[in-house]
Amino acid sequence: MNRGVRTTVLLCVAFIALVLGALFYSVLREPLLDEVALREQGTFLLPARREIASFSLTDHRGVEFNNTRLAGHWSLLYFGFTACPDVCPVTLSVLAQVEQKLAAEGQPELLNQLQVYFVSVDPERDDAATLGKYLAAFSPRFVGVTGSHETLAAFAAQLNAAFMKVPDANGGYVIDHTGNIVIVDPDGRYAGFIKLPHDADKILMAYKSMARNG
């Protein structure tokens, strides 16, 4: 290899190392938010994380969804229904943006340690096929979950996720439900919630802070 080529190669290697170093430094120096700062951004962590009693639901692929599915990663659960006209699609769009931002930042570990679950509280209309088609419009990583009304009510109660069927003027019904995003830690414990209004950048920073603080 002649001197000119060697110099070019060394300069390219040095440039790549500089870029990677800058990226690594920018990730490391991101400020972690404490509980006070998290609350100011709408994320509320419980003083003591709560164990979740055994439950059994079904995901949109027909696979059982139970406590073991919540272990080993951070989970963000949103309770809603596919016929929801506003807050559900908006919230799922925001959560999809969180995934996209993690991917764009080149942080596959953090992305792989995050799982979004959409828990339908309208089992009469939201079967597996309906859930799967609905969620595909937001992210291929999202998992839809549902079950009997009784099982859903018991599961939601553990996570302070209230919902109620309300008759509408057309003889049908809508579902009144919480707008909070529920946080479950990698040990499968109820860790807190994120209040409305939801913002992708704030949720992203909250997630990074929780993931790095443990």
Sequence positions of predicted segments:
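N-terminal targeting signals for export/organelle localization
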Residues: 1-54, 213-214
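Short extracytoplasmic
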Residues: 39-75
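Extracytoplasmic
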Residues: 50-52, 70-74, 111-116, 126, ...
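Short active-site neighborhood of thiol/selenol oxidoreductases, capturing the structured segment around
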Residues: 65-95
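Structural alpha/beta surface segment adjacent to cysteine/selenocysteine redox centers
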Residues: 75, 83, 112-140
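Conserved helix-turn-beta segment immediately C-terminal to the redox Cys motif
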Residues: 92-116
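Short, internal strand/loop/helix patches
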Residues: 117, 130-178
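Thiol-/selenol-based redox modules, centered on thioredoxin-like
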Residues: 167-214
